[in-house]
């Protein structure tokens, strides 16, 4: 274990000592028969039932998992892989170089944590990896007696629920978040697919928790805005000159100059541009400015088949099904003269940062995470531990070559490719942008050099293309980390020529991304090489307005390489500065999102409480008490002199709450009360009438249908108001920076206004819930003579479904809709449905508990 001598990490030293204990058990479990080894899972579970901690069985569980991996996959995890697994079980990030077998490393910690029966989720960056790992690693877990599930997009709810109920669930990261949001939009608790978020192990953790940290997961609904405003602001922005706006190259922020503001005021006929009344227009204008002057085609997005497709700037892949939110997507559509989609309304949203922080325990694997350790600690409370390679790295990382111009750089790149190709050494060229990969593609065509291009426009058979990049003579151009997760294995001939040569055409915004590109070469001790070619024209230098200065200093070099340590230090300094800025930006996003997170936690908790309660009468009565205090605050109930208008109060309460009740408020009900006493008096009467109505409904329909109606009334009001609140907070977030002009703190203002909005949200939920409950259509029978009558519904095929009158009014349409769906089903299934509908009330009620069983 000489390679461990220099490791100083406390976690690593702890893992090293545990590794010795694990190795000491090798002979013990090697002597076990297959059945004896499999039975250890039951032994561990029995110990856990007796409140033995996971930590106390960790050593044995890891040793068992190691032996099982060998027997099933014929691969015995290396010592460094076991150490990596221990780091993961500590709830930290294990940094393992590319090709070191992170997937095998995950087996032991996943096995150990799955023994509790609370569920373990393994999150991957795409569905291909989720399917692959669930199949391959799943063999080991199933052999050991654990169940393995695969969660995919567009799966039916029942299959998703089954996948999450497994001991171990593999899933792409985005679907985990969307399932969480959808679970908090269901109408019954039984419809949820996820269980408690216990332990998540994230593969490529830096990609998900760092690169995609700012990207919110959004479930959208109905249209919220007209498209005309996008067209108008787009037309206006096209008239602007470069003196009308200013771009901060460092932060990519864009704002109108004083001249631009005057031009805007004149165009839109405003006296004052920056006030909250004009915030909607300013928001659209900012999006149009950003779309035209900051967002670059073939960099952040591409246009394919008349559609705007987003490009992951870190991988170069198209992000399927993703779009910019808050109107930026529509602004880009207007810019590119494609059809403008109506902006959708946000129904639910959460960032990856806040979703994964919901897990009780979190860990992750990556090839490059140490440079972002402070962010992992600050936001996720996860340390990053570097795991040594099993075999020393043999790759040679050559110093970068720097050129004055973009053209000179690519001229040198082509010459280098020609030199390497002449001796059949395989080359992987990494570019940061689609347009650069296309540019190099044209240059290589002119030189008659056979090559393959992999970018957002050319991404078919990605894994296959990347896998073949190690064949002797292969030239592969890929945007950044396309093909991440797929091994590049050089053949024997290419290894003789020096192995895979990774050629980077510019430095990225993070050293981590550059290290990922280098890591494609030299896996498991293979030989390999890497070198970066960079120029003063590169975005890294342009962002800090250093381009002209450096070009003037080094003009004498023309097309030749710049030999100067100062310029290389400038690139390193710029890269570190951008890393810091991006971290601050992600932390700022988290601060704002934490305001919504706290509110979301309250709403979702209340929502679950409503779904789980069998009797909501106390909840309704508390709403009545709360609402009664709010009613007399309504301004329209007061005269010009400020006195409470009792007549207006009577009319308002009767109209909103007493439509179907025998009782009606009169002036006499309030004349003998002072204003301070009215809320309590009003509350007492409303509760009395509510109890009478509920008693009637329970007697006629049963407790379950009555509670079901009340539950749906409250959930409906809660969902509607919460969705409105989310969109209101979105708009506030976009416009709040305007308060800087009045010397106010935007975040403080956002928090204060957001809190007031949330307090109003709570009141509005109670108000709307009561309006529905107190006007329950089923209660209209209270004022009629005679018995309930069953209703017969004739379906399209002529058959008749009989619906008992004691079925709550609000779900009758859902029953009919489901019946129509069943027209396509077998006759036997329809008979079961009709039998249940016509059976005694208890059976009907049971069916209503879970509409997915209808």
From Swiss-Prot:
This is Protein translocase subunit SecA. GO terms for biological process: intracellular protein transmembrane transport; protein import; protein targeting; protein transport by the Sec complex. Pfam families: P-loop_SecA, SecA_DEAD, SecA_PP_bind, SecA_SW. ATP binds at residues 81, 99-103, 487. It is a peripheral membrane protein. One of its GO terms (molecular function) is protein-exporting ATPase activity. It is found in: Cell membrane; Cytoplasm. It comes from Mycoplasma mobile (strain ATCC 43663 / 163K / NCTC 11711).
């Amino acid at each position: 274990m000489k390679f461990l001598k220099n490791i100083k990490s406390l976690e690593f030293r702890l893992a090293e000592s545990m590794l010795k204990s694990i190795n000491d058990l090798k002979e013990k479990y090697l002597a076990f028969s297959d059945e004896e080894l499999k039975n250890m899972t039951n032994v561990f579970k029995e110990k856990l039932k007796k409140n033995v901690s996971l930590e106390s069985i960790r050593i044995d569980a890891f040793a068992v998992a190691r032996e099982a991996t060998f027997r099933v996959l014929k691969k015995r995890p290396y010592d460094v892989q076991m150490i990596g697994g221990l780091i993961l079980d500590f709830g930290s990030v294990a940094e393992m170089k590319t090709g070191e077998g992170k997937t095998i490393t995950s087996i032991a910690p996943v096995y150990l944590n799955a023994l509790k029966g609370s569920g373990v989720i393994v999150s991957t960056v795409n569905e291909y990896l989720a399917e692959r790992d669930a199949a391959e690693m799943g063999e080991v877990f199933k052999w050991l007696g654990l169940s393995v599930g695969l969660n995919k997009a567009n799966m039916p709810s029942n299959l998703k629920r089954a996948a999450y109920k497994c001991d171990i669930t593999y899933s792409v990261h985005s679907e985990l978040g969307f399932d969480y949001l959808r679970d908090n939009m269901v109408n019954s608790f039984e419809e949820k697919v996820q269980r408690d978020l216990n332990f998540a192990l994230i593969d490529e953790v830096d990609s998900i928790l760092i690169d995609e940290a700012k990207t919110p997961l959004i479930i959208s609904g109905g249209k919220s805005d007209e498209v005309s405003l996008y067209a108008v602001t787009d037309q206006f922005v096209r008239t602007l000159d470069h003196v009308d706006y200013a771009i901060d190259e460092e932060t990519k922020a864009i704002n109108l100059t004083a001249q631009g503001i005057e031009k805007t005021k004149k165009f839109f006929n405003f006296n004052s541009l920056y006030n909250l009344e004009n915030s909607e227009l300013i928001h659209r204008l900012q999006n149009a400015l950003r779309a035209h002057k900051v967002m670059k085609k073939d960099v952040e997005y591409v246009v394919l088949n008349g559609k705007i497709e987003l490009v992951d700037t870190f991988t170069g892949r198209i992000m399927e099904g993703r779009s910019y939110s808050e109107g930026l997507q529509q602004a880009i559509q207007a810019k590119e003269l494609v059809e403008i989609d109506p902006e959708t309304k946000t129904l639910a949203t959460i960032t990856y940062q806040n979703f994964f922080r919901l897990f009780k325990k979190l860990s992750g694997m990556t090839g490059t995470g140490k440079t972002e350790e402070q962010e992992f600690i600050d936001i996720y409370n996860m340390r990053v531990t570097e795991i040594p390679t099993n075999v020393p790295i043999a790759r040679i990382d050559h110093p970068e070559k720097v050129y004055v111009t973009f053209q000179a750089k690519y001229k040198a790149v082509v010459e280098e490719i020609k030199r390497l190709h002449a001796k059949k050494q395989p080359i992987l060229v990494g570019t940061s942008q689609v347009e650069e990969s296309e540019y190099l593609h044209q240059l290589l065509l002119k030189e008659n050099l056979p090559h393959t291009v992999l970018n957002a426009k050319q991404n078919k058979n990605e894994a296959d293309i990347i896998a073949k990049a190690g064949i002797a003579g292969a030239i592969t151009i890929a945007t950044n980390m396309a093909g991440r997760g797929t091994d590049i294995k050089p053949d024997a001939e290419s290894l003789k020529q020096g192995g895979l040569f990774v050629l980077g055409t510019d430095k990225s915004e993070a050293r981590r991304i550059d290290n990922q590109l280098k890591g494609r070469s030299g896996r498991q001790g293979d030989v390999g090489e890497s070198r970066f070619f960079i120029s003063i024209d590169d975005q890294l230098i342009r962002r800090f307005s250093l381009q002209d200065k450096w070009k003037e200093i080094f003009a004498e070099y023309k097309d030749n390489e710049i030999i100067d340590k100062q310029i290389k230090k400038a690139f390193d300094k710029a890269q570190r500065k951008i890393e810091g800025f991006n971290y601050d930006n992600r932390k700022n996003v988290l601060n704002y999102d934490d305001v919504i997170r706290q509110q979301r936690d309250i709403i979702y908790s209340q929502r679950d409480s409503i779904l789980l309660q069998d009797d909501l009468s106390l909840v309704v009565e508390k709403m009545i008490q709360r609402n009664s205090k709010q009613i007399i605050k309504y301004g329209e109930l007061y005269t010009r002199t400020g006195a409470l208008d009792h007549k207006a109060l009577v009319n308002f309460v009767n109209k909103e709450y007493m439509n179907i009740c025998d009782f009606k408020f009169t002036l006499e009900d309030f004349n003998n009360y002072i204003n301070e006493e009215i809320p309590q008096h009003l509350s007492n009467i409303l509760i009395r009438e509510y109890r009478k109505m509920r008693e009637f409904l329970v007697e006629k329909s049963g407790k379950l249908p009555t509670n079901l109606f009340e539950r749906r009334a409250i959930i409906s009001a809660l969902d509607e108001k919460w969705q409105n609140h989310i969109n209101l907070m979105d708009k506030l977030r976009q416009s709040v920076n305007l308060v800087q002009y009045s010397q106010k703190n935007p975040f403080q203002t956002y928090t204060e206004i957001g809190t007031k909005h949330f307090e109003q949200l709570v009141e509005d939920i109670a108000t709307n819930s009561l309006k529905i409950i107190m006007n329950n259509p089923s209660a209209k029978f209270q004022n009629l003579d005679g018995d309930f009558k069953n209703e017969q519904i004739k379906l399209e095929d002529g058959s008749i479904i009989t619906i008992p009158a004691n079925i709550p009014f609000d779900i009758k349409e859902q029953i009919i809709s489901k019946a129509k769906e069943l027209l396509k089903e077998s006759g036997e299934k329809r008979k079961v449905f009709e039998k249940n509908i016509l059976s005694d009330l208890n059976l009907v009620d049971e069916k209503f508990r879970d509409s997915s069983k209808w």
